[in-house]
């Protein structure tokens, strides 16, 4: 399932996966240093040994008298020959040392430095990008919380207004109108929580905190050229240090968010261009008079006097008063509604801003993961080359060391970059690419212009289609596109290649907030990008088409019945029958499309396997990822079975459902009163609870009116038309699970108990038994 860095080091927070990869790559940097030190020592040893050999050939001649030298003596000739060979061996070792320095050590050192710098640069870029994403993520949570609080305040006020009589309401309105703007502001905000960073304070609590800050941190005058000197200032790092020492602010991100909110609340002012808070000694901030007044303290100096000499500063300081005058005639109801609209606008902008940042982070990480895999591959290949160079150097100069040179060649052949990459993935991978989308969640459950990351059932209900429009439109577009492609190989490859994430995100952005998904928009992009955005849509769903709660059950089926194909397919058929109607219809659409493509192309078996590897996580994925799952092949096998036997499974489901539907009609007509069973979704309390909770119509409502003659023929069958009686037990289970929030383990055990039995009657009895136990608890 995980075959490369680009699909192996992802995590929900992005930082965990990236950190794990760099920890592994740092081992390679350390290995480079060890090899470099070994080569240096080996070079020095050869150099010292060669010099020593030459030295001893000279030492042996000391004390020997020239007249005692007999050129004709054989012993003297042997002595001179031995001395010459030893001296020559010394020269060879010195030449080896020089070649090691110039041909191996110097290039290897350069490669090692370049490799280390590449990793450091990549790590710094990714760290900064992820930190920026985290800041925007925390900003989104803060703006969402503020928006929800404003909505609740408005609801509370409206409820209180309904309960009070008109006379009391008029008296309260008159009282608030007579009171001064400052008193009115204090009364209105007295019960509101003030949010600073990731903390919330009541006004009296914030008063104590501000008083302590202003009394403990050193305040000084700060001179700005031309504008003059400003009192009551300090640098950003002083404020951050105080916050981390005195408040539960564990991280710099949280501290900077706290400081940013001090600016937003009007307690602090940045001495310079812009209004951002930065933890730095170079950024200075002035505590406004509002902070001293709120804390019940007197500022050392007032900026009012400076304002007389500096009209620009006076205008800046009067913004707050102008704002209060602008809305002084508002009633409390108008003010609350305005604040809700303002908070909603800020929250929705934060969602869009975070989504853009997230896609940029994912594109950057994907590019860097590919780059880092290439860096590691090049490093290992360099090892392979330098082993061969070392063997050549030794064998050329010292034939007697041929055995050592041959052994080095053996070591060189052992090095396989692909194996090293695979080892890193198998031992340290954190998970495949499974993006986490933060969608705009309106307080009143209204999602209008979002497609990606939205639950498939909600999206289908909004589109008034049984299959989301984005899925059906893309599949229809591909059907029209296939005949125009050059060959079967091209038609297969567009499903197997991974398009650049930046291109996929560009099409995603064009579709996500558009009023409709059109083929005209799709035609502006390559086929592989269109298929890439379809895969991305499935990956960004809150849960996979085959829910994560069934992941362990599917694993159990393939572990226990991998060789018994008929029984395994029957269990899968039972599993699919319990999916939600929209999930069934969507799964049917994609599998039917792919099965038709497989049928019309050659090399069906190979294409099916490759396609299953590419799409397995789009159809079924676990709730959480771990190392044990990454070696699990059952998602791919499950996808292979769907691609191979899907049409047969769906046809069998249609036949079983048709016969059961006829029997249900006979029983209904022969009985004066409808049957009452625990699994029937026709119970009034079940239907009402589902409608009130999901705001989606009951699955039965679209099918109960069908007459037998209206049941689609085999050639027309898709799971969009599966009658609801087949999935009644699954829908009842899904409703109860949603409302009562069952644990994962209990849901898995109950599902396993259902699929062990082969008879549909036993399945219904098992569900009914479980329902009775749940109602008792």
Swiss-Prot record:
Q: Which GO terms describe its cellular component?
A: cell cortex of cell tip; cell division site; cytoplasm; division septum; growing cell tip; medial cortex
Primary residence: cytoplasm
Q: Which InterPro entries match?
A: AH/BAR_dom_sf, DEP_dom, F_BAR, FCH_dom, Rho_GTPase_activation_prot, RhoGAP_dom, WH-like_DNA-bd_sf, WH_DNA-bd_sf
Q: PROSITE patterns, alphabetically?
A: DEP, F_BAR, RHOGAP
Please list the GO biological process terms of this entry.
cytoskeleton organization; establishment or maintenance of actin cytoskeleton polarity; small GTPase-mediated signal transduction
Which CDD domains does the entry link to? DEP_fRgd2, RhoGAP_fRGD2
Tell me the ranges covered by the F-BAR domain, including all copies.
3-420
Which Pfam families does the entry link to? DEP (PF00610), FCH (PF00611), RhoGAP (PF00620)
| Site keyed Arginine finger: positions | 496
Q: Which residues form the Rho-GAP domain?
A: 454-650
* Positions carrying Phosphoserine: 676, 680, 686, 698
Q: Where are stretches of biased composition, namely Polar residues?
A: 668-692
| Role description | Acts in signal transduction. Negatively regulates the pak1/shk1 control pathway.
- How is this protein named in the record? Rho-GTPase-activating protein 8
What taxonomic ancestry is recorded? Answer: Eukaryota, Fungi, Dikarya, Ascomycota, Taphrinomycotina
């Amino acid at each position: 399932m995980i075959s490369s860095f680009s699909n192996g080091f992802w995590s929900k927070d992005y930082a965990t996966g990236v950190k794990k990869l760099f920890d592994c790559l740092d081992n390679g940097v350390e290995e480079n240093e060890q090899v470099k030190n070994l080569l240096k020592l080996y070079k020095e040893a050869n150099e010292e040994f060669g010099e020593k050999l030459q030295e001893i050939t000279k030492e042996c001649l000391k004390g020997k008298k020239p007249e005692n030298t007999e050129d004709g003596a054989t012993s003297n000739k042997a002595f001179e020959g031995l001395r010459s060979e030893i001296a020559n061996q010394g020269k060879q070792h010195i030449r080896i040392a020089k070649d090691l320095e110039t041909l191996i050590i110097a290039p290897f050192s350069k490669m090692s430095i370049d490799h280390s710098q590449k990793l450091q640069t990549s790590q710094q870029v990714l760290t900064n990008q992820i930190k920026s994403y985290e800041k925007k993520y925390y900003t989104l949570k803060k703006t969402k919380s503020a928006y929800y609080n404003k909505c609740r305040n408005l609801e509370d006020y409206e409820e209180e207004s309904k309960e009070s009589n008109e006379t009391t309401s008029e008296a309260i309105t008159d009282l608030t109108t007579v009171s001064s703007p400052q008193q009115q502001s204090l009364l209105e905000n007295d019960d509101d929580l003030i949010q600073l960073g990731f903390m919330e304070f009541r006004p009296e609590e914030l008063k104590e905190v501000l008083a302590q800050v202003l009394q403990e941190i050193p305040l000084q005058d700060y001179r700005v050229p031309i504008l003059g000197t400003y009192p009551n200032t300090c640098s950003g790092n002083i404020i951050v240090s105080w916050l981390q020492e005195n408040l539960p602010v564990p991280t710099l991100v949280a501290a900077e968010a706290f400081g940013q909110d001090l600016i937003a609340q009007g307690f602090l002012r940045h001495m310079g261009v812009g209004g951002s808070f930065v933890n730095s000694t170079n950024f200075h901030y002035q505590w406004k008079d509002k902070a001293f007044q709120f804390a019940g303290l007197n500022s050392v100096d007032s900026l009012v006097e400076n304002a007389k000499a500096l009209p620009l500063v006076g205008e800046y300081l009067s913004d707050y008063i102008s704002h209060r005058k602008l809305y002084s005639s508002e009633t409390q109801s108008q003010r609350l509604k305005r604040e809700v609209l303002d908070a909603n606008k800020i929250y929705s902008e934060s969602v869009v801003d975070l989504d853009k940042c997230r896609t940029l982070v994912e594109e950057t990480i994907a590019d860097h993961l590919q780059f880092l895999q290439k860096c590691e591959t090049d490093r290992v290949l360099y090892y392979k080359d330098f082993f061969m160079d070392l063997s050549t150097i030794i064998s050329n100069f010292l034939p007697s060391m041929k055995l050592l040179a041959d052994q080095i060649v053996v070591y060189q052949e052992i090095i396989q970059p692909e194996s090293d990459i695979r080892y890193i993935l198998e031992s340290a991978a954190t998970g495949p690419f499974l993006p986490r989308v933060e969608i705009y969640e309106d307080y009143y459950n209204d999602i209008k212009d979002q497609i990606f990351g939205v639950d498939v059932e909600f999206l289908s209900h909004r589109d008034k289609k049984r299959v989301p429009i984005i899925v059906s439109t893309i599949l229809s577009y591909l059907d029209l596109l296939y005949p125009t492609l050059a060959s079967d190989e091209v038609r297969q490859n567009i499903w197997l290649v991974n398009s650049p994430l930046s291109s996929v995100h560009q099409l995603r952005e064009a579709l996500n907030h558009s009023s409709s998904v059109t083929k005209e928009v799709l035609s502006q992009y390559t086929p592989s990008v269109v298929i890439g955005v379809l895969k991305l849509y499935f990956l960004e769903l809150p849960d996979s088409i085959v829910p994560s709660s069934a992941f362990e059950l599917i694993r159990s089926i393939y572990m226990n019945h991998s060789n018994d194909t008929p029984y395994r397919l029957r269990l899968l058929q039972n599993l699919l029958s319990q999916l939600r109607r929209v999930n069934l219809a969507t799964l049917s659409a994609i599998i039917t499309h792919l099965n038709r493509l497989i049928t019309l192309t050659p090399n069906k078996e190979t294409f099916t396997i490759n396609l299953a590897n590419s799409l397995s996580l789009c159809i079924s994925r676990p709730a959480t990822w771990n190392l044990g799952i990454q070696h699990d092949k059952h998602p791919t096998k499950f996808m292979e079975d769907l691609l191979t036997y899907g049409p047969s499974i769906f046809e069998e489901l249609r036949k079983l459902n048709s016969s059961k539907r006829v029997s249900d009609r006979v029983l209904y007509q022969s009985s004066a009163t409808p049957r009452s069973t625990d699994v029937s979704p026709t119970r009034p309390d079940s239907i009402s609870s589902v409608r009130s909770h999901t705001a989606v119509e009951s699955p039965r409502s679209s099918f109960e009116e069908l007459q037998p003659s209206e049941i689609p023929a085999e050639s027309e069958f898709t799971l969009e038309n599966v009658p609801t009686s087949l999935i009644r037990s699954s829908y009842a289970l899904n409703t109860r699970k949603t409302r009562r929030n069952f644990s994962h383990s209990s849901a898995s055990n109950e599902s396993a108990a259902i699929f062990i039995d082969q008879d549909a009657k036993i399945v219904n009895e098992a569900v009914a038994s479980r329902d009775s136990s749940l109602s008792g608890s």
